Amino acid sequence: MTSPFNRPAGRAAVLAPEGWRAAAGWCAVVLLLTLALTAVTGCSPPSPGLAVRVDGNRLVNAQGEQVRLLGADRSGAEYACVQRLGILAGPADRRSVAAMTSWGIDSVRLPLNEDCWLGINGVPARFGGARYRAAIRAYVTELNSAGVYVILDLHWNAPGRLLATGQQPMADLDHAPAFWASVASAFRANPAVVFDLYNEPHGISWQCWRNGCVLPQGWNAAGMQTLVNAVRATGARQPVIASGLGSGNDLSSWLRYKPYDAAGQLVAGFHVYNFLPCASVACWDQAVAPVARHVPVVATELGEVRCADAFIDTFMNWADQAGVSYLGWAWNPAGCGAPSLISSWDGRPTAYGMGLRAHLMAMGRPGT
């Protein structure tokens, strides 16, 4: 999702999901994979007692008890670094995390920028590379310490020497495998982290989604199988999320084309907004429920743009019955039509955010 607070440089802000860019060849990929694996020094330690893994079509904790990831997206790290605004574009301290947990949030999705993580394509050193990675690791540690699971999401990317200033139809073969090799190496010892392989695939076939292809724009897309392989080659065994086509809103052929994961930790990602095609109980029953009978489904982005909560209320009630996880877009202060859950970093909800907060609190989420 692109919002007024994370607009691509040189582009007007849009409300609908976005993504619109000559392959460097396998030698470049191999080189970047090598650099990525050595670029991160040390691994983020696991948080005591906080863990999540796939068990059949459920997510479970370290004790084998079923859990659902219920929370919010924290936008910022995907855009601030390339727009020279900083790294996280907002507070990342204990107080700001406490504002989240006061809602009953137990999961936060953190969108990332591959160029900033890898420190390539002209990203300023003060915002990218080692400093960016250190800031992300520190924020993950802060969230985990508060009992919050973290989903790390490849959100902004670009092929070749282009700077990653927005989303694309799919992950790029030039840098995305290196990105995931590096991220997975950094967090492979942390069982409270989940990897969201690519934010919003769109405008491609299901074959390309799984296996990669040459896009009309002239560069090579990396398929979900390549991204799964990049993560597993590091020894990381955390759950991996593969979001559907149609900007994550289409799971119609997900089961047929799902990538193979030797670790058995595959999760289906779903994006649901009131302006996307699959936005009714009938569609969720037809397209999402069948997937949820086989693998866990996480709605990694949930929102509506009418400064209201009727739509998300309908989805959350459906998801509670179906065992589907969900995270609201987004925990950033802006107008409720962005959509934005909060009007200030202290957790004051917008008219739209009141719906998510009330629902989590009514469920008796920890921290409420």
Kindly give the residue locations of the regions a language model identified.
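Bacterial N-terminal signal peptides
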Residues: 26-39
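A mature extracytoplasmic/lumenal domain signature
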Residues: 73, 112-114, 154-156, 199, ...
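Short acidic-hydrophobic catalytic motif
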Residues: 165
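N-terminal secretory signal peptides that target proteins for export/translocation
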Residues: 1-22
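Extracellular glycoside hydrolase catalytic/binding regions
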Residues: 51, 85, 89, 168, ...
